């Protein structure tokens, strides 16, 4: 941010090995495994006290000029300062989500207004809040082991979020 640059997430994939218990001691590790002047890719691991992986994630983010909120290239000198680590060994699905061509209609769910508690430092709904909204939209008791999120147009304070759901043989989709 000191250079007037930020990063907006474009997509995230989370593979869940097991859900931690409430109050369980956890360690979060994150690192960059790919980066160029336009975007960067990052792994994140959630580890239990024994060092076992509870969840593995990868995300891709695009660099933005914070004064215009538009995508930008970072200066080469900044790119040269980025330390890359090897990518975590996991299944990397394409970052672009293709919604299923479903014969049944999507179920419209209750609308939600983006309130102040959901807003991040860039004045948009925080990425984690989209996860919360999606989880809330799942059918009661729905068990999942993988989450994929595509971040499109960022919602701002006061925006009306209108989720819809489709359950197929491949899984449950929230849009």
Task: Label each residue range with its predicted role.
Residues 1-9, 56-58, 65-145:
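Hot-dog-fold acyl-thioester-processing enzymes
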Residues 15-101, 151-160, 166-175:
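HotDog/MaoC-like acyl-thioester-processing domains
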Residues 4-19, 142-154:
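Small beta-barrel nucleic-acid-binding modules, principally OB-folds
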């Amino acid at each position: 941010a000191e250079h007037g640059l930020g990063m907006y997430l474009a997509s995230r994939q989370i593979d869940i090995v097991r859900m931690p218990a409430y109050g369980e001691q956890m360690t979060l590790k994150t690192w960059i495994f790919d980066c160029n002047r336009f975007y960067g890719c990052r792994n994140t691991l959630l580890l239990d006290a024994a060092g076992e992986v509870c969840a593995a994630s990868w995300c891709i983010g695009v660099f933005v000029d914070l004064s215009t909120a538009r995508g930008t290239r970072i200066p080469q000198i900044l790119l040269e300062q980025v330390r890359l680590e090897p990518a975590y060994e996991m299944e990397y699905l394409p970052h672009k989500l293709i919604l299923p061509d479903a014969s049944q209609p999507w179920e419209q769910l209750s609308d939600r207004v983006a309130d102040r508690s959901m807003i991040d430092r860039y004045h948009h709904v925080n990425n984690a809040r989209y996860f919360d909204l999606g989880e809330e939209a799942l059918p009661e008791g729905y068990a999942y082991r993988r989450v994929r999120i595509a971040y499109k147009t960022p919602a701002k304070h006061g925006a009306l979020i209108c989720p819809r759901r489709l359950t197929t043989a491949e899984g449950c989709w929230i849009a």
